[in-house]
Amino acid sequence: MDKEITVRVGTPEDVDGMMTLALAACKENGLTNPNPVKLLHEIWAGLTRHHGIVGIIGEPNTEFEAAILLRAEPMWYSDDLTLVERAVFVHPDFRSAKGGRARLLCEFAKQASEMLDIPLVIGILSSERVSGKVRLYERQFGPQSGAYWIYGKKTGDWVKDTTPEDVLTEQ
């Protein structure tokens, strides 16, 4: 029998697995060269629940299948908190697997928003496989509220001009 796929709340012990997944997400879909220190700062805040939370699909001390990073912060023009999605990422090895991992991460985000009683701001900033992501988000969240445009680059392009060593040594 297949094991049920669930999203668990991340803990500080998940930091290495989250960093690995985050760097993979940045390599595939980041707009610019990632700063591992900034990634760690955001991830650590979510793992320690300091104005954030992380949802993870995968067991501790293994390679994670998928994750979502959410941060509670005000919009730039307000003091009221919103729950802002920093990243949703399903590892490529699990995208076509049964279980609807992206859907489960969306449900995790909605539950967090409802429990905190603050609005969720979530979106798609990608140059690849956009239409399928839009359909998923419309099913999960209803009609969209805006859109993004990127001028001058595509997500993931920074990798073409960077070596793996650059990512880890430039910071």
Regions found by a protein language model. Give the residues of each.
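A short helix-loop-beta-strand connector motif used in the catalytic cores of GNAT acetyltransferases and
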Residues: 43-56
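Conserved GNAT-fold acetyl-CoA-binding loop/helix
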Residues: 23-43
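A short, internal acetyl-CoA/4′-phosphopantetheine-binding micro-motif in the GNAT/acyltransferase core
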Residues: 86-99
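Conserved acetyl-CoA-binding loop-helix of GNAT-fold acetyltransferases
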Residues: 96-111
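A conserved beta-turn-beta hairpin within the catalytic core of GNAT-like acetyltransferases
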Residues: 74-85, 144
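Conserved beta-strand-loop-alpha-helix junction that forms the acyl-donor binding cleft
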Residues: 120-133
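Conserved beta-strand in the GNAT
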Residues: 63-73
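A short beta-loop-alpha structural element at the N-terminal edge
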Residues: 4-20
